[in-house]
Structures are given as C-alpha cells and as structure tokens.
Amino acid sequence: DVVWGCVSQVGDQSSNIGRYAVLAAGWPEHIPGTTVNRACGSSQQALDFAVQAVMSGQQDVVVAGGVEVMSRVPLGSARSTGMPYGPKVLARYDDFSFNQGISAEMIAQRWGFSRTRLDEYSAQSHERAAAAQDAGAFKDQIVPVFTDGGPVTDDEGIRRGTTVEKLSGLKPAFTEDGGWPIAFDT
C-alpha cells in the first residue's frame, strides 16, 4: 500500500495524489494508494497509519510520505463560495473564524508562551535536529530518492544556523496585531 499526506489537495495535488504517484512511478496497477489530509500533520499521519498497518500485521510493506508544493496552490483555493464549517460548528464557536494558526495564537496566550520562548524553542529544535542528522540518527529512517539533480539522502527541512535573532525578525504568520507564532514556530 501507499499512504501519502497532502493538505492542499487542489490543482496538481488534487483527487488522490497518493494513488496517482503510484501510477506515475510506473508501479503495478494493483498497488493501492491513498491520500490523507490532517492539515499540517498530514505526512506524519500518513507515516503513522503505515506503521500501524505493518505493526498490526494487516500489511507487510507500506510506503508512506507526503507532498505539498505550496507555490502550485492558488491562494484561497481550498475555500469554496460557502463557509468551510457547517452550521453546528459555527454555532458552537459563535461564528468565530478559526484555523490552525489562530489556534496556535490562542494556545500561546492561554499558556503564556512568549514570542521569545517560541523562537528559542524553534531554534533549539533545528539545532538538535541538525546534530542528530550529523550523528547519523536518521540514516535508517530515510530511503534515498534519486532525482535528476542527484540522490536526496537527508531531511532537507532542517534549517541549520537558525538563531533566535534571525527568527525575531520574522513577522507573525497569523495575526497583524502583535501575535506570537511565526511560520517557523508552528
């Protein structure tokens, strides 16, 4: 099986990109594929589902991963002409417009996480990830992918050299009135 995470399933990423990736790769048509949308955690959820399937004995082999090319997703394309929430959800939250970014703001405020604290945590997280990568901690977890530009053998999402000072220069991602979380922190 193939389980793929993708939050913005529109345009090139629409329908069931997990299944289409199987076909585009030239794999046999009998290999199924599915796509998971759990917002920012889609790829992690795909991996979790794959691990659960193998651990439970339901599958022998599952390929898991994720895809998202935000530059190919038109801004606002996930919204239709209607509301993304039904009347019961809107009633429950007094017609308050919410999303994951606003949720991060609310959590930061509720638990007293300052912008500095969030930036410190982000910088430390990337520093630790880089050290773990350098020590080979992820080598048995990543299968090399061969591209025209050469093999990809490491997680390229780690931002080496990230500092609190650099992060403090980034604008808040979700509010314009002094919010805390930036894209790097969430």
Predicted regions mapped to residue ranges:
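Short glycine-/small-residue-rich flexible loop motifs, especially phosphate/cofactor-binding loops
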Residues: 19, 105, 130
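Active-site-proximal alpha-helical scaffold in enzymes
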Residues: 37-67, 108-138
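N-terminal beta1-alpha1-beta2 module of alpha/beta enzyme domains
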Residues: 1
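Conserved catalytic cysteine-centered active-site region
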Residues: 4-60, 95-102, 168-186
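N-terminal extracellular/periplasmic Venus flytrap/periplasmic-binding protein-like
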Residues: 117-186
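Short, well-ordered secondary-structure micro-motifs
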Residues: 13-15, 73-75, 154-156
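Glycine-rich nucleotide phosphate-binding loop and flanking beta-alpha elements
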Residues: 10, 69-71, 129
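Flexible glycine-/small-residue-enriched beta->alpha junction loops
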Residues: 51, 55-110
